[in-house]
Amino acid sequence: MVETFLASSAKKFYEYLLENNKGVEVIPHRQAEFKNPTLTIHLKQKLFGLENVFLEIDGKDHLIEKEGDVEYVAYDEDNLVLILKFNTPEFYKDSFILKSDLKFLVKNVEQFFISQTIALPTKPPFSPKLTSLLPDLNAEQQRAIMRIFSHPLVYIWGAPGSGKTQRVLFQAIEKLIEADKKIALVAPTNNALEQAIKTLIEKFDEQGIARESILRLGIPTLEFSLKYPELCEKTKKENNLFSANPRERIKTANVLAMTLDGFVARYGGLDVEFDHIFLDECAFAPLPKVCTLCACNAPITLLGDHKQLQPVCEITQSDKQKDNELKIWGYSGIYLEHIFSDRLFEEKLDFQYTKASVLKQTHRYGNNLASILNEHIYQNGLRGKDEESGLYFLDTSKLNTQNIKHNGEKNISPAEVVGVKQVFNSRFDWAVITPFVNQRKILIRNGLPYDKVFTIHGSQGQEFDGIIFSPVILSYYLTDSHNPQALYALNVAISRMRKKLVIVCDYDYWIAQEGQFIQRLLLGSKPYKEE
């Protein structure tokens, strides 16, 4: 049985993390202030998620959860401030450790498959009348919507800006709300979930759909809870709908929005029957967790782009190759049907049950960039808009690095730090992205704002008007486009931009890298001149 295999897989992954001292990350903080019963913590870094954060006090872990010993009050992602409330204040001690523990989430997956049965969805989706669709839908988007309502398992594949969320997802959810159906909107991370909800709410407001049709389960960021209090499961705003009966809101809301980990933890207690499930950013979601969505026999629509980042997995490549029960944690959710067959480990995405719909037109990129992405990555006829994307380079080969602070770390480029500082200014919505952790550190050490400098994984789910990209060096795992995973990661970095991309690098070094994606981008770029 699939459930037995998945439960065993989760148990083995848990033991692997335990034996190899992995999965636990101490979250550093700058300072903390306790005013009974509230603890305010100023963090040094963003939290990846909120479902697996603990406070260790006197050697004991306290899960931060609703109505637990410690619960969330607010998380201000922009200012890196976490506010907690102690329901049992005597537990507090000045010497505490804030940490995230992946093992807790893996244990939840094991418990889920012990208690639930799963199967590929067979229930036909609700079929609404599609005579009143948005007037600006293109033919590909219309076909995608029709496919969602004609088959139990559908994958909508599209590059950034192709309308997966703003057009296809919104239109499908709108039709289901009109019919008073129950919908689960799921995403692999807090950030991805809130981005999807924000996009939907913009369309809801345009079309006159009540915001309270959506209920966001779990812990929102402070910015989200202040902007959309009526959507949140718990908020101190007086006008939120939860002042009455939380259980009633779960029953009456058409859309229950939650992270994938939230679905795993709460599905058994929700006591609702979903008519349709949508998983956004499915390619970034680990396959075992995505399998939990199959407990409902509700139609499932996967939305995403498998030519971008795959799930983060703490299992080494060599260990994955030795054991299939560990290996599946590196597979993404688009392989959902494969786990119910003997085709999963053939390393081939070969849909037989899943119906795919491809969106090949993007409004994010000009044709100049779309053609490069199609040539190297998508190879599906990707088209952009007529207006060109701004592609530029700044050559660092002759820049003076004398004043750059560094300790000779591996995988850094002081010259690129100089170049980035020449381009970056606060008058434009810039973000700096580099594949290398050490390069990010020295960029910040030399004056770049920490909240504007990202590794590729850290930039996932965010957008900026301009991206300054610091590639540092050719690396098989991070920048060598002959490695598909590195190529897809580079695609993520590029796709964070709305208007401009500036590649700050040693131009001659990269131009000599024949056949590389970065070389092709440089060939299509112009020298950068500050406007």
Segments (PLM) and residue ranges:
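Pre-ATPase regulatory/linker segments immediately N-terminal to the P-loop/RecA-like helicase/translocase core
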Residues: M1-M146, I209, L217-K237, Q310, ...
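N-terminal pre-P-loop "Q-motif" helix
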Residues: L133-P152, A159, R167, M258
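Short hydrophobic/aromatic beta-strand immediately N-terminal to the Walker A/P-loop
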Residues: V154-W157, A184
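Phosphate-binding Walker
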Residues: W157, G163-Q171, N190, Q195
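Walker A/P-loop NTP-binding motif
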Residues: T165-A179, T199-I201
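Conserved helicase motor core of SF1/SF2 NTP-dependent helicases
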Residues: E178, N191, D261-F263, G268-L279, ...
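A substrate-engagement module of RecA-like helicase motors
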Residues: K182, I197-N254
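Conserved Walker A/P-loop ATP-binding site and its immediately adjacent core
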Residues: I183-E202, V437
